[in-house]
Amino acid sequence: MSSVTFLGTGGGRMVVLNQLRKSGGFWLKLDNVNILQDPGPGSLVMVHQLRLKPRDLDAIMLSHMHIDHSNDVNVVTEAMTGGGFHPRVRLIVPADCMNSDPVVLQYIRPFVGITEIKKGMEITLGEVKIGFPIQTMHPVETYGIIYSFKEGRLGYIPDTEYFPELAGAYRGVDFLIINVVRMKTDKRIRHLNMDEAAKLIGEIHPKRAILTHFGLQVLKADPELQAKNISEKTGVDVMAAHDGMSVNFEKKENHEWF
């Protein structure tokens, strides 16, 4: 059964630096393929606390290089390759994670096969197809992702400011994970706010959406209440993630998710 497990749901400097929520990204198990998405600070600690096994990972994926999404990429790479003695896995990252201001250490690179993300590309891991339909609007090179697997299609909207083309890139997904750092827009900080997230969810209209990557404003406003409000507004099943939460992606015959 495919699933997502949240190794952290915190976003933004105040939440991450003070660990008001954990910040380890999320672990996807899709058709028996295991992928760690955006391993921020404390990711490896949460992996072990939740009794997941780094050696089970098939890939690490970075949406972008910022520290709350990439801090643990090197130590998790060490863990999933047995210190480099079992170099069988893949690291999938934007080019600037390797080049301009690299977050992947040189000595780690021979341990893994490295794929540099480009807009519009598609790759396959086992039976899982992974597409990168859009480059988002963020201060560094950042890509949205769609995972296609047996139970459906999962879209991930990482850090970005709102722009009109965003919703169209995700239309047709069954399931959506969306980073929502703020309640109100600050143009200096290129992140989605809650109203923009609600608009995207309404336009994309997945069967279920999960909010995560909460900044301090969102925590004060109660993420669960915000998810309920968006559900009522859009008719979509919306939930707020919490640290350690797992959700199964199983489709019933009537095509509902639970």
Where in this protein do the model-derived segments appear?
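Binuclear metal-dependent phosphoesterase catalytic core
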Residues: 240-258
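Active-site neighborhood of phospho(di)ester-bond hydrolases with catalytic His/Asp-centered motifs
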Residues: 36-40, 58-68, 94, 155-160, ...
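Short beta->alpha connector loops
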Residues: 41-42, 96-97, 136-139, 159-163
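Metallo-beta-lactamase
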Residues: 86-142, 149-151, 250, 257
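Cap/insert and terminal regions of metallo-dependent hydrolase folds
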Residues: 162-245
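Metal-dependent catalytic neighborhoods of phosphoester/phosphodiester hydrolases
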Residues: 71-80, 104, 219-228
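Active-site metal-binding motif and surrounding structural segment of the metallo-beta-lactamase
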Residues: 42-92, 174-175
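Conserved beta-strand hairpin/beta-sheet module of binuclear metal-dependent hydrolase folds
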Residues: 1-50, 142-158, 175
